[in-house]
Amino acid sequence: MIDLENSTEFEIDTLNLENIANTLTTKDIELIVVKNDEIQELNKEYRNIDKPTDVLSFPMNFEVIDMPLLGSIVISTDFVQEKAKEFKHSFNEEFTLLFIHGLLHLLGFDHEIDNGEHRLKEEELIEKFKLPSSLIVRNS
């Protein structure tokens, strides 16, 4: 299940996101939708990077047995709008790409240190759900 916290004016359709999440996990996901100023604060606090970013993931501690929550994904709608326009696809498609990217981080994938597994899993999901190329795929 996706627990949506949306502090923006954008309508977020969680049905497709639920379908994607359910192919990878049975755990719950907290999805927080914000603007650049809010994600910048989080980026500074947790990564010591004082600028906005597109998506952040906060996995739960797996030492807790049977924890129903996988973690939290935070997405900036400002980035979604910008990239959707730049790459000529819909807001919903770009949002879904960022959701997939964040979800894979919650599941332990890390494109910054792995041998391409994160990119390959993203490509698999992009193809399965008929989405345009994601940032990680566009940059490879």
From Swiss-Prot:
GO-annotated biological processes: rRNA processing
Main location per the UniProt record: cytoplasm
EC number per UniProt: 3.1.-.-
InterPro entries membership: MetalPrtase_cat_dom_sf_prd (IPR023091), YbeY (IPR002036), YbeY_CS (IPR020549)
Cofactor note as given: Binds 1 zinc ion.
Enzyme type, top EC level: hydrolase
Cofactor(s) demanded: Zn(2+)
Binding site for Zn(2+): 101, 105, 111
GO molecular function (one): metalloendopeptidase activity
Keyword terms, alphabetized: Cytoplasm, Endonuclease, Hydrolase, Metal-binding, Nuclease, Ribosome biogenesis, rRNA processing, Zinc
Ubl conjugation keyword on record: no
GO CC, any one term: cytoplasm
Disulfide pattern: none
Source superkingdom: Bacteria
Compartment(s) of residence: Cytoplasm
PANTHER family for this protein: ENDORIBONUCLEASE YBEY, CHLOROPLASTIC (PTHR46986:SF1)
Record family assignment: Belongs to the endoribonuclease YbeY family.
Protein name: Endoribonuclease YbeY
